[in-house]
Structures are given as C-alpha cells and as structure tokens.
A protein has these predicted regions:
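Macromolecular interaction modules
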Residues: 1-102
C-alpha cells in the first residue's frame, strides 16, 4: 500500500477555498482515479506544538495498492487534475509518495 500525500504549505498570502476543494475538486479526483484509489483522507492544519501555526493549511492522503497503480490512474488525468488547483488555491502543492510500513 502506498500513500500519495499532497501538502499545501502555510505561507503568507496563501488562500485556500475549502468549499470548492471539498465539493468540486476532490469529487473530480475520485472520479478520475476510479477503483485504483482505495481511500482518501483530507485534513486541515490547525496548529503545531507550542501554539505555532500549522506547517500546512491542508494535506490530502490518497491510497493506492502500489506506485504503478497510482501512475496508471493518475497519468491520463494529471493535466486536468493539476490544472484545477488554481481554482481553489494560490499555493503550490508539494507531493510525496510514501510506502506503508506498519
């Protein structure tokens, strides 16, 4: 099992439209990725230890069986999915692929 984590850093002047993201963008992502997408979790950053601000305003974890399954599902739709990002944020997302160990 792998997780593709999409992270939106908390930055000065950053904006994020949660209504569009949750009601339009994420349903589109789910539809495009189809059965290859095993689960998805979205989190809103609320803070860090010591009362500091969250490092990321939002993170999305998308779960797939393996990297080839992700690449096969995402590849044909990458331009459309990533092209939708400016409709809900001016923050450049950071993406990382993690392998589940435990």
């Amino acid at each position: 099992m792998i997780r593709v984590i999409v992270m939106y850093p908390n930055k000065a002047g950053g904006t994020f439209n949660y209504d569009y993201y949750l009601k339009t963008h994420m349903p589109m992502v789910k539809q495009k990725l189809g059965a290859a997408l095993k689960d998805v979790r979205v989190f809103k950053g609320v803070g860090a230890p010591g009362g500091k601000p969250a490092g990321f305003v939002t993170t999305a974890s998308l779960f797939f069986d393996d990297v080839p399954a992700f690449e096969k599902a995402f590849g044909p739709h990458a331009a459309e999915i990533m092209g939708d990002v400016p409709k809900f944020t001016n923050i450049e997302p950071q993406v990382q692929i993690d392998e589940r160990l435990l």
